[in-house]
């Protein structure tokens, strides 16, 4: 089973940010937010975790969409015309940015990308 939702673009609303994902075979109605984010250094992405009873699904947010995350708004992902709030995304990313800053363990390319956008 495919376990990744790939974000392709960002839409801004008055008080919200919508990460627009490519169409997916993943059924998002049964998923819930896990309030946790991982780092994908190879693809310069943050991975927000969604889950259901049997699996984890990763919402891959590429570096090309990070700049919009600097706004203090509610963030959602839209998959197959369904929007789901990515609860705690901003706080998780802020925590990761603190850990990534100057940390070669994440790889020079990721560190540079994070520092350019968030610092």
Curated annotation (Swiss-Prot):
Domain of life: Bacteria
Family affiliation: Belongs to the UPF0738 family.
Designated name of the protein: UPF0738 protein BA_1211/GBAA_1211/BAS1118
Organism: Bacillus anthracis
């Amino acid at each position: 089973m495919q376990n990744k939702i790939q974000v392709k673009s960002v839409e801004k609303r008055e008080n919200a940010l919508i990460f627009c994902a490519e169409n997916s075979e993943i059924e998002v109605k049964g998923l819930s937010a896990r309030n946790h984010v991982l780092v994908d250094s190879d693809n310069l992405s943050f991975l927000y975790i969604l889950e259901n009873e049997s699996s984890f699904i990763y919402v891959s947010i590429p570096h090309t969409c990070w700049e919009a995350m600097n706004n203090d708004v509610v963030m959602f992902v839209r998959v197959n015309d369904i929007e789901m709030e990515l609860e705690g995304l901003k706080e998780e990313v802020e925590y990761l940015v603190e850990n990534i800053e100057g940390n070669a363990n994440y790889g020079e390319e990721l560190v540079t990308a994070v520092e350019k956008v968030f610092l």
